[in-house]
Amino acid sequence: MIRRRKKVRKLRGSHTHGWGCKKKHRGGGSKGGRGMAGTGKRKDQKWTWTIKYAPDRLGKRGFHRPKAVQYIPKVINLNDIDENFELFKDAGIIYEEDGKLVFDATALGVDKILGTGKLTRALVVKAYYVTPKAEEKIKAAGGEVLLA
């Protein structure tokens, strides 16, 4: 009967498991650094790898508009107007004109009225821009929209 050693037993008892000297298979120093070390702009160690697998890793690409030029509109939802009604009235942002309550979004520094939430009062809304959904809800509450 042939008794064959299992492959699992290979290299048992060997100090180095085929790596020669113990130092050769020790830390990151034998591999050119750990992970992606050495792939920086000086492009020495792993440059061939970088060119093949990560060509966009270094250098700039695209364009970013300066923050000063970017326009992000200031917005307010209908539910915010409804919840802070008294606060706006005290501040003079909501005032009475010809027997109607007027909400002046331009005085608040808001550019756009959004349609999230409900409006429970009839308001005349002055704004630079009102979304169609918001306009629909304002009119349903008995108010009107005036674009500034």
UniProtKB/Swiss-Prot annotation:
Gene3D superfamilies: 3.100.10.10, 4.10.990.10. One of its GO terms (molecular function) is rRNA binding. Residues 1-28 have a biased composition (Basic residues). Residues 1-43 are annotated as: Disordered. It comes from the Archaea. The keyword ATP-binding does not apply. Pfam families: Ribosomal_L27A (PF00828). GO terms for cellular component: cytosolic large ribosomal subunit. InterPro entries: Rbsml_uL15_N, Ribosomal_uL15, Ribosomal_uL15/eL18, Ribosomal_uL15/eL18_sf, Ribosomal_uL15_CS. GO terms for biological process: translation. Residues 29-38 have a biased composition (Gly residues). Keywords: Ribonucleoprotein, Ribosomal protein, RNA-binding, rRNA-binding. Part of the 50S ribosomal subunit. Belongs to the universal ribosomal protein uL15 family. Binds to the 23S rRNA. This is Large ribosomal subunit protein uL15. It comes from Thermococcus kodakarensis (strain ATCC BAA-918 / JCM 12380 / KOD1) (Pyrococcus kodakaraensis (strain KOD1)). The lineage of its organism: Archaea, Methanobacteriati, Methanobacteriota, Thermococci, Thermococcales.
